[in-house]
Amino acid sequence: MQYIPLKEKYEKEIRNAMMKEFGYKNIHQVPRLEKIVINMGIGEGSRNKDVIDIHAKELALIAGQKPVVTRAKKSISNFKIRKGMPIGLKVTLRGLRMYNFLYKLINLVLPKVRDFRGLNPNGFDGRGNYSFGLTEQLVFPEISPDQVRRVQGMDIVIVTTAKTDEEARKLLELFGFPFKRQ
């Protein structure tokens, strides 16, 4: 088996397979990946600025670009959060970085997840976008277990131009996503 970058694979194989299956007349009608958003919600970040900095460095290593600090939209007294306090990090990947991250996710990260039986097929939102979470950042090859002070999970959202969940699922399956059998 030869390594083919995912963007090339999409243009040569996946797009044609999708056109045949769904009967598209034009290649521009075929769903494609738009972006991947990685979000880390860090509740402790409002009290400890160092935690945000540590996880920002980790997320930058994982994604290949600097994350944006997300801030609280409004104050919530029960959580001791004021408006504007840092409560998380997010990265939006597009273009080549998106395809590189997707390749790493499918081939390196998901196989390393403990007790992994496949991705939940119910993670679609009705508009062709897929969301799932990882419970720890240690499954990424860039993160060394010795340097991790605190295990932190993340949410990953894959945004496609697909109109329906069925089209999006087929697109992601052709990219190599390991979904659970229903």
Curated annotation (Swiss-Prot):
It comes from the Bacteria. InterPro entries: Ribosomal_uL5, Ribosomal_uL5_bac-type, Ribosomal_uL5_C, Ribosomal_uL5_CS, Ribosomal_uL5_dom_sf, Ribosomal_uL5_N. Gene3D superfamilies: 3.30.1440.10. GO terms for molecular function: rRNA binding; structural constituent of ribosome; tRNA binding. NCBIfam families: PRK00010.1. Part of the 50S ribosomal subunit; part of the 5S rRNA/L5/L18/L25 subcomplex. Contacts the 5S rRNA and the P site tRNA. Forms a bridge to the 30S subunit in the 70S ribosome. This is Large ribosomal subunit protein uL5. It comes from Thermosipho melanesiensis (strain DSM 12029 / CIP 104789 / BI429). The lineage of its organism: Bacteria, Thermotogati, Thermotogota, Thermotogae, Thermotogales.
